[in-house]
From Swiss-Prot:
Keywords: Cell cycle, Cell division, Cell inner membrane, Cell membrane, Cell shape, Cell wall biogenesis/degradation, Magnesium, Membrane, Metal-binding, Peptidoglycan synthesis, Transferase, Transmembrane, Transmembrane helix. One of its GO terms (biological process) is cell wall organization. Signal peptide: none annotated. This is Phospho-N-acetylmuramoyl-pentapeptide-transferase. InterPro entries: Glycosyl_transferase_4, PNAcMuramoyl-5peptid_Trfase, PNAcMuramoyl-5peptid_Trfase_CS. Belongs to the glycosyltransferase 4 family. MraY subfamily. It comes from Gloeobacter violaceus (strain ATCC 29082 / PCC 7421). The gene is mraY.
């Protein structure tokens, strides 16, 4: 009898991501399990009420026609799911860490980025098309919020944060703004498959929280709450997704991760643990750049990938959506382990 290889289900990938995150927190920061578990539960339960409301409000996703054909069946799935999981991720930490100034700053940045995403999602829904605010408008809004955040950072005496690279001085500004806007957009780009941004975001947030917990405990609480919120969202966003997070969710996740990294001086760690986001963003940049560089008089150019971002390249190569997500989870977990090893030297050499 011939055995047929079947792709993993959405539940299987989501449970694997949850097991990785839960085990890491239980082992290395058991006191934070309450924050993580409470946020996960609140988001999961809220989703059962929020998703039908989004469907009733006709907050429907519009699928790009030039994307994979298999995604056309997702048209009409509710979007803007960030409105029910991001608030829990940003509110719960205050119950455990109090009104810490750094926590307030990080939450304010994530909230402002989520608001930019909400404006984009709202315009898409209102116009009944896949065109929200323009990329230029979105970038200007993200930069504006980033500048305000950096002003707080500088005025509070952290403007010379090292990021593990030595004192930066005036270079703090461009590097911090690049991290804030770049991470937000990278997570946004990654959010193209069911459960992809949520699972990889949870893994990245967990390890970043473990890294900063000794020196910035309030920011660590935010990270663990964000991880719980992302996994709670997977209850509804795993394949086959009943809701998408939209820019409301993805920009807020990226903003929160970057804000924690900037405030704690851990941008190198962010780049490593968020390597999946970095590669996804670079795949788009490389695809566009190569196409323009090889464009002939007829206006046609060559492509490095079958389709960008990278997850679509693998889809068009024959992998099922859940197989791509599972592999990206594995890559995210491997990068998380590498980041933790570089940070702590664990496991010790013989």
């Amino acid at each position: 009898m011939e055995l047929v290889s079947r792709p993993p289900t959405g539940w299987l990938s989501a449970l694997a991501a949850g097991a990785i995150v839960s085990a890491a927190i239980a082992w290395l920061a058991p006191a934070q399990l309450v924050v993580f578990g409470l946020t996960l539960l609140l988001v999961a339960l809220t989703g059962f009420a929020a998703v039908p409301l989004l469907r009733r409000w006709k907050a429907r996703q519009f699928i790009r026609e030039d994307g994979p054909r298999s995604h056309l069946k997702k048209a009409g799935t509710p979007t803007m799911g960030g409105i029910f999981f991001i608030p829990w991720a940003l509110v719960v930490p205050f119950a455990f860490a109090g009104w810490n100034p750094e926590l307030i700053a990080a939450v304010a940045l994530a909230t402002s980025y989520g608001l930019v995403g909400w404006i984009d999602d709202f315009q898409i829904i209102r116009r009944q098309s896949n065109n929200g605010i323009t990329p230029r408008q979105k970038m200007l809004l993200l930069i504006g919020a980033g500048v305000a955040f950096c002003l707080f950072h500088g005025l509070s005496g952290h403007g010379t944060a090292t990021f593990g690279l030595g004192e930066l001085g005036i270079l703090f500004w461009p590097l911090a703004l690049l991290a804030l806007t770049g991470t937000a957009n990278a997570v946004n780009i990654t959010d193209g498959l069911d459960g992809l941004a949520g699972g990889t975001g949870a893994i990245a947030a967990t390890v970043l929280g473990l890294i900063v917990i000794a020196t910035h405990p309030a920011l660590a609480v935010l990270c663990f709450a964000l991880a719980g919120a992302c996994l709670g969202f997977l209850v509804h966003n795993r394949h086959k997704a009943t809701v998408f997070m939209g820019d409301t969710g993805s920009l807020a996740i990226g903003g929160a991760l970057a804000a924690v990294a900037v405030l704690s001086g851990q941008l190198v760690a962010l780049a490593l643990v968020g390597g999946v986001f970095v590669v996804e963003a670079l795949s788009v940049i490389a695809q566009v750049g190569y196409f323009k560089a090889t464009k002939g008089p007829d206006g046609k150019g060559k492509r490095l990938l079958r389709m960008a971002p990278l997850h679509h390249h693998f889809e068009l190569g024959g992998l099922h959506e859940t197989q791509v997500v599972a592999r990206f989870y594995l890559a995210g977990a491997s990068l998380a382990l590498l980041t933790w090893w570089l940070h702590t030297g664990w496991p010790p050499s013989a």
